[in-house]
């Protein structure tokens, strides 16, 4: 597999074409951002950890019957993925009140929600990733009703699977955001990444009841170095994959 021209560079990843028209080459970067890029820093080792974490999570999800764009990890910071047409949506699942949700509704952070909440935002830094409802998504032609039904179904299935995965490593899955895309043959699949950059993860191991962040809130809120937290998540996930006999794509 040959890496060809760079197609895109975002806040955390670079995307390249390959000599296979159906496969893209992803390189994870060390840049950390918050507030739609208003806060930035280079953090040594972050790209490698996120590449490793998302790879093992996609493997764990596949073992639970959830397919994705992920093909395989090919180096410390790189992986191959299926080429897809992406829906310009951030798909957010919330299990516990935290962050902007808690502020928006005046709910104490850490309050358990009676049922998981599915939210959508238009993926646009220029517009500030505005919220959009189901009718708006269909009316603007972002996705058809049938596509949106499938995206929503998959988001809830991913949430159920991730809650199972993280509960087994003593981590509370507070919320997360994902993206979805459509393959050339019309399949809608989970895409982008699932890492502590895109999830809120609270440690349950010490049993103190105090919130111990294992995610990008450490950077976002100036609470400390993210690297030890990301390393801890990766180590626990690898042990789970080994215990479950999950086949690794690398």
Curated annotation (Swiss-Prot):
InterPro entries this protein is in?
SAICAR_synt/ADE2_N (IPR028923), SAICAR_synt_PurC (IPR033934), SAICAR_synth (IPR001636), SAICAR_synthetase (IPR050089)
Q: Which GO terms describe its biological process?
A: 'de novo' IMP biosynthetic process; cobalamin biosynthetic process
Enzyme Commission code: 6.3.2.6
> Which keywords belong to this entry?
ATP-binding, Ligase, Nucleotide-binding, Purine biosynthesis
Which top-level enzyme class is recorded in the Swiss-Prot or TrEMBL entry? ligase
Cite the SUPFAM superfamilies for this sequence: SAICAR synthase-like
GO MF: ATP binding; phosphoribosylaminoimidazolesuccinocarboxamide synthase activity
Task: Give any Pfam family that matches.
Answer: SAICAR_synt
State the reactions this protein catalyses: 5-amino-1-(5-phospho-D-ribosyl)imidazole-4-carboxylate + L-aspartate + ATP = (2S)-2-[5-amino-1-(5-phospho-beta-D-ribosyl)imidazole-4-carboxamido]succinate + ADP + phosphate + 2 H(+)
In terms of CDD domains, this protein maps to: SAICAR_synt_PurC (cd01415)
Which protein family is named in the record? Answer: Belongs to the SAICAR synthetase family.
Q: Which NCBIfam families match?
A: purC
Q: What name appears for this protein in its UniProt entry?
A: Phosphoribosylaminoimidazole-succinocarboxamide synthase
Please report the organism this UniProt entry assigns to the protein. Answer: Bifidobacterium animalis subsp. lactis (strain AD011)
> Gene that codes for this?
purC
